[in-house]
Swiss-Prot record:
One Gene Ontology term from the biological process aspect of the record: cell division
A GO term for molecular function: ribosome binding
Domain of life of the source: Bacteria
Species this protein is from: Aromatoleum aromaticum (strain DSM 19018 / LMG 30748 / EbN1)
Record-given protein name: Trigger factor
Entry keywords, A to Z: Cell cycle, Cell division, Chaperone, Cytoplasm, Isomerase, Rotamase
Gene Ontology CC: one annotated term: cytoplasm
Domains (record comment): Consists of 3 domains; the N-terminus binds the ribosome, the middle domain has PPIase activity, while the C-terminus has intrinsic chaperone activity on its own.
Classification via Pfam families: FKBP_C (PF00254), Trigger_C (PF05698), Trigger_N (PF05697)
The keyword Calcium belongs to this UniProt entry's keyword annotation: no
Entry keyword Isomerase: yes
Catalytic reaction(s) noted: [protein]-peptidylproline (omega=180) = [protein]-peptidylproline (omega=0)
Gene: tig
Length: 434
């Protein structure tokens, strides 16, 4: 076999190969003989079909398979000889034979990039710092109370926080527009489910009162034919209900899972859950900065084949997510190209982290994996059951090991970068800051 190799770009390679036709002919004969032992044809006993008939019937198939095997072997031999790390599958291109009696072809493919690990000492990482106190516990309990709000009819004008029931009809240029009319429509004033101007118009009205008002839809309104348009609404209030929040007492504690209704235990559980969530959020924000630092310090090109494969996987994940929400993805196109930028980032990080793990021996240790699983299990009703679930299948344990490896990478990078603590508020950390 004769071969020549050339570099066509940073990661693209081309190998021209030549295989003697005599070798292929020999392989064709071998395949036909194997077929002849088992082939069945009318009028012949199994294994007794004449070779001439076998060749006439299966010759094209045998030659196609022989050529495919020869191409695969030639390419594989060359890759091993050159110690190339091939990314994706090669594109095989036939060539006009320069030598009589030879099959000539080219394999065009990509290779994995070299990943020289860069200096991280100039990179900065801010670590959020937050101690969960009584104020955070109080705020969370208040949220839990609001989630259990009940409503009671009142005889007064509607105000912020009230649930109202209305009939409404909207007109544009004197004509009803699509989606602009409803009866017995409920919503909570101030909850954000309706436009602010609409909510403001309802505020101050009592049951039985009717009001006509004008408003202008926002320029970015989702219905294009209404965006930026002035319309007129007529509304009639049919119900006004005031919110009733449950008291912080034994009943609320029991409703939130504290069997004996002890409010102190409720606060302790809320605090413990908040501390776990704060820790998770801090780790997430630090991890984001660490990954960005790795990308900045280690600029690399990535094979298109890997990016395309990752884009397809992300698109499939998005489809499954939509299906889990009850949507029919046949009517919703999800194109891999939408995820190209995300795929490039993920592939780069995957290559950089793999090199870093090998170079610095940041592999997951069994005791690390167990500690991580034990910590996760603490938020479950039956921690031991979750531990058994992870250890029941190697695939699940592999997922836990991947998380530990990622944590090891983050810890190592933090030891190499300029890290400084930054005190943040609860809302800032949770992404609720105005």
């Amino acid at each position: 076999m004769q071969t020549t190799q050339e570099t066509q770009g940073a990661l693209e390679r081309r190998i021209d190969m030549s295989v003697p036709m005599a070798e292929i002919d020999k392989e064709v004969d071998s395949r036909l003989k194997r077929m002849a032992r088992t082939v069945k044809m009318p009028g012949f006993r199994p294994g007794k079909v004449p070779m001439k008939i076998v060749a006439q019937t299966y010759g094209s198939q045998a030659r196609s398979e022989a050529i495919g095997a020869a191409v695969e072997k030639a390419f594989g031999d060359k890759v091993r000889e050159q110690n190339l790390r091939v990314a994706g599958y090669p594109r095989i291109e036939p060539r006009e034979a320069a030598v009589e009696g030879a099959l000539e072809f080219s394999a065009v493919f990509e290779v994995y990039p070299q990943v020289p690990l860069g200096d991280l000492s100039g990179q900065k990482v801010e670590r959020p710092v937050l101690t969960v106190g009584d104020a955070e516990v109080d705020k969370t309990i208040e949220v839990l109370r609001k989630q259990r709000t009940t409503f009671e009819a009142v005889d007064r004008p509607a105000q912020d926080g009230d649930r109202v029931v209305i009939d409404f009809a909207g007109r544009k240029d004197g004509e009803l527009f699509e989606g602009g009319k409803a009866q017995d429509f409920p919503f909570v004033i101030g909850a954000g489910s309706m436009l602010k101007d609409f909510e403001s118009a309802v505020g101050g009205l009592k049951v039985g009162e009717t009001k006509t008002f004008e408003m202008t839809f926002p320029e970015d309104y989702h219905a294009a034919d209404l965006a930026g348009q002035k319309v007129e609404f007529e509304i009639t209030v049919k119900g006004v209900e005031a919110p009733i929040l449950p008291a912080v007492d034994a009943d609320l504690a029991r409703a939130l899972g504290v069997a004996d209704g002890d409010v102190t235990k409720l606060r302790d559980e809320v605090r413990a859950n908040l501390e776990r969530e704060v820790k998770r959020r801090i780790q997430g924000k630090v991890k984001e900065q660490v990954m960005e630092a790795l990308l900045v310090a280690n600029p690399i090109e990535v094979p298109k084949a890997l990016v395309e494969a990752e884009s397809r996987q992300l698109a499939e994940n998005a489809k499954r997510d939509l299906e889990m929400r009850g949507m029919n993805t046949k009517d919703i196109p999800v194109e891999p190209t939408w995820f190209a930028d995300q795929a490039v980032r993920r592939v780069k990080l995957g290559l950089i982290m793999a090199e870093l793990v090998n170079a610095k021996e940041l592999y997951a240790k069994p005791e690390q994996v167990r500690a991580m699983i034990d910590e996760m299990a603490q938020s479950y009703e039956d921690p031991a059951e979750l531990v058994r679930w992870y250890y029941a299948q190697p695939e699940r344990l592999g997922q836990a090991e991947a998380v530990v490896i990622e944590d090891n990478v983050v810890a190592w990078v933090l030891s190499q970068t300029q890290t400084e603590d930054k005190t943040v508020t609860f809302d800032e950390l949770m992404g609720n800051a105005a």
